[in-house]
Amino acid sequence: MAKKLAITLTRSVIGRPEDQRITVKTLGLRKMHQTVVHNDNPAIRGMINKVAHLVTVKEIEE
């Protein structure tokens, strides 16, 4: 099956630049320690790289 990514917001977006806030919101994260699951594709990987210091990522098989 396709790989999926479990993305968890581990640091706050308070005081972060607007583009990083928008990226976190686009990933579907609203609250601290919230986890969302996305398909593993280049677009999602690019967003993760942009806010890598705010999130943790786990690869999961489904």
From Swiss-Prot:
MF terms in GO: structural constituent of ribosome
Write down the CDD domains for this protein, in alphabetical order: Ribosomal_L30
Which Gene Ontology BP terms does the record give?
translation
SUPFAM superfamilies of this UniProt entry? Ribosomal protein L30p/L7e (SSF55129)
Quote the PROSITE patterns the UniProt record gives.
RIBOSOMAL_L30 (PS00634)
Q: Does the keyword Ribosomal protein apply?
A: yes
Sorted alphabetically, which InterPro entries does this protein's record hold? Ribo_uL30_ferredoxin-like_sf (IPR036919), Ribosomal_uL30_bac-type (IPR005996), Ribosomal_uL30_CS (IPR018038), Ribosomal_uL30_ferredoxin-like (IPR016082)
Annotated Gene Ontology cellular component terms: cytosolic large ribosomal subunit
The transmembrane segments are: none
**UniProt key word Ribonucleoprotein:** yes
Q: Which UniProt keywords apply?
A: Ribonucleoprotein, Ribosomal protein
- Family label: Belongs to the universal ribosomal protein uL30 family.
User: How does this protein assemble?
Assistant: Part of the 50S ribosomal subunit.
Protein name, UniProt field: Large ribosomal subunit protein uL30
Q: Which organism is it from?
A: Geobacillus thermodenitrificans (strain NG80-2)
Ranked from the top, the taxonomy reads: Bacteria, Bacillati, Bacillota, Bacilli, Bacillales
